[in-house]
Amino acid sequence: MEYDVVIIGGGPSGLSTAIKLKQLDSNLNVCLLEKASEIGAHILSGNVFETRALDELLPNWRELNSPIKTKVKKEKFLFLGKTKSLSWPTWLLPAVQQNHKNYIISLANLCRWLAEQAESLGVEIFPGFPASEILYNEDGAVKGVATQDMGIDKDGNKKESFEPGIELLGKVTVFAEGCRGHLGKQLIEKFELNKDKDPQQYGIGFKEIWEIDDKNHEEGLVMHTAGWPLDNSTYGGSFMYHAENKQVFLGYVIGLDYKNPHLSPYDEFQRFKTHPAIKKIIEGGKRISYGARALIEGGFQSLPKMFMPGALLVGCDAGTLNMPKIKGSHTAMKSGMIAAETIHYHFQKGDDLSVYDKIFKESWLYKELYRARNVKPSFSWGLILGIIF
């Protein structure tokens, strides 16, 4: 199967790439592969969303029945001791950590809605088809991907339901797999995209969705915490977002550069939920969903080159998360939009994909990540100094 553009991954960056491509040229044949059974099935819900990229991509999103409904109405930041908590005035927090213009959303629902917008423009979306292999031309340029064979038993034998994988060929292939995408890692190594860059850094994030008692629910509340149960030298903290329908998105992030070999991130999350400031909110509630994900935290200094012959990297496949904002959806979307502009220029002018670098450096995304470049490294001095920095 041949297309103008093949996109791997149905998250914010991949879907934004697809939408922008069709906006720029409705005649392009664009397909998007998603490994999950449906768009959003592998997205951990719960997100404080900055609409900057969406305002550019779909300026009329408010009229398109989007799932973006719950505005942030109130913020709290707590330093936790073992049993006590100290409330930090939110007006003392850096502007990048203030959320009064943002929304509490389900990221999975946002992706489902973006998929609807993409399909309405003519994008072909194939859920349930994980890309398993990168295909190359004789000159070494990426020419597409192959999906994995289906109907293989545990011993590698073909079952009656066997279906061979398919090759999807594109003039350009966009990799939008998310953090540590297995194909993206191969490309970074093969094309030395991280040459002269700082080593990438990672964290692990746990997220749960709770349905809590009405008396404990405050729709529009965003709360973050730092401190207990982690020590001052370990990077990490929590978030709690009060969404609609008495739901709370509760999560905990720990940097994987922690020094204590006995530390268990999962157990620290469980301890965190026993703190009186947290327990009083979720007590009597019901956990209805949970999961964990790797997070890419290296920031600006660790960003690999995002273009190579025949392909582009976008979103967390490259590492566009803004750590001080604790946000990556709007940056992932913008990186996908830049990829679409690059591809459009490439098809119009015949230049190679290196123009991505020029468009990226002229964008607000580059400026935002550049301004945030030293925040994560500052936490090597300890929690308090890192927050002050």
Please give the residue ranges for each predicted region.
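Active-site-proximal substrate-binding core of FAD-dependent oxidoreductases
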Residues: G319-K325, E341-I384
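Glycine-rich phosphate/pyrophosphate-binding beta-alpha loops
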Residues: I104, D317-H330
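N-terminal Rossmann-like FAD-binding beta1-loop-alpha1 element of flavoenzymes
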Residues: Y3-C31
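A short alpha-helix-loop-beta-strand transition element characteristic
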Residues: L58-E75, G128, N194-Y202, L353
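N-terminal FAD cofactor-binding segment of flavoenzymes
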Residues: K35-T83
